[in-house]
Amino acid sequence: MKVSLFVTCLIDLFYTNVGKATVELLERLGCEIDFPEAQTCCGQPAYNSGYIKDAKEAMKQMMRAFADADYVVTPSGSCAAMLKEYPHIFRGDPEWEEEAKRLAAKTYELTQFLVNVLRVEDVGASLPGRATYHTSCHMTRLLGEKEVPLRLLEHVKGLELVPLPNAHQCCGFGGTFSVKMGPISEQMVDEKIEHIEEVKADYLIGADCGCLMNIGGRIGRVGKPIRVMHIAEVLNHRN
């Protein structure tokens, strides 16, 4: 099965290990990985900031880059959700509406692709320790996904998975929200860390690098001994 990988801006710039883990995991499961070099930002930051014209140019480039893809897989619920918004954004556009529909239909967040397309829940991962999972807003509210990541994590050997109190509460990142509403964002992420400490987790796992950057950055600043990992890194981990 040929898979075209959309790496996202945060992975490309800050979390290259997540991209590497995604490739290794998919290849181990028998996928042939293609990386369209013409891919760019999905347009979400510009779109959410009101720069619609600029955002649409990025979106058009994404549609060109992945035009020949069979499956588009990304280790990001947020960016996958944005690609699935393209049909709404380009509704009524005679040139781009159908392209937007095609890209949206073949786009999958990584864990959804593993479970719903490859039909795999146990990927052979192992990671000893106690972990809790942060559910990102876009993963649940836009993609409507709550259970698939947990089903995969439940099969990781040696990993004790404990529920996170108020798991569906925003971590305070919210893209530009954390910039525009800094003090509020800081209080939100502090509350999130309190809940992580409450369950005595060794690991905080998530599926969106924006959340992990926000939570992990704050954990580092306050000096808490909690390791932050993307779910792709966990699923690719072998002892």
From Swiss-Prot:
InterPro entries: Cys_rich_dom, LutA. One of its GO terms (biological process) is lactate metabolic process. GO terms for molecular function: oxidoreductase activity. It comes from the Bacteria. One of its GO terms (cellular component) is cytosol. It holds the Pfam family CCG. Belongs to the LutA/YkgE family. Is involved in L-lactate degradation and allows cells to grow with lactate as the sole carbon source. This is Lactate utilization protein A. The gene is lutA.
